[in-house]
Swiss-Prot record:
One of its GO terms (biological process) is L-histidine biosynthetic process. Its EC number is 2.4.2.17. It comes from Helicobacter hepaticus (strain ATCC 51449 / 3B1). This is ATP phosphoribosyltransferase. It comes from the Bacteria. The gene is hisG. It catalyses: 1-(5-phospho-beta-D-ribosyl)-ATP + diphosphate = 5-phospho-alpha-D-ribose 1-diphosphate + ATP.
Amino acid sequence: MIKVALPKGRIANESLALFERLYGSKFVFDDRKLILEHQGFIFMLVRSQDVPTYVIHQAVDIGIVGLDVIEEQQANVVKLLNLGIGKCKVVVGSELGKSIDYQKPQLKIATKMPHITRKYFSNKAISIEALKLYGSIELAPLVGLSDAIVDIVETGVTMKQNNLKIDEVIMESSAYLIANKNSFYEKKELILALYERLKSTLDSK
């Protein structure tokens, strides 16, 4: 039996669709249920940001989560396979019609991802203050809270609708299959068998 943490929403749905292709069987959570046991797997629905925590502490054996979450949390996990689903970009954005003033002694950057943000600007030798927000990031530069934002975009439409533009792409992200280090050794055959099946299915696309 392999325990799997899935992030609620689109990535969970796309992941379950992958498992359906692999095993020729429906993988469907009952209404409002957070646990699904099927075909030798126990799936658990959790918040995206919590997937690495479940994996690191071996509450589950493996998880599926975006590379952006792994990088932000510097998660100590085994990265097994890029599943190519849940594709998005982490970008620097600012108000339309304005340029980011890099001459300022320190820029204020609003973000849900302070680690990725600090690392990116540090590598460019730009001094910043990362303002951690939990939602409505797009609002920050429009009301003078920040000079720019670092946020996740899929198409960029939401930014345009909020009078913002993409200035720079920090990284491209998609969902990865990750494993707990102990589980990887304790259940190596099972996990590697799943890895091979997933890889074969993805390669045949």
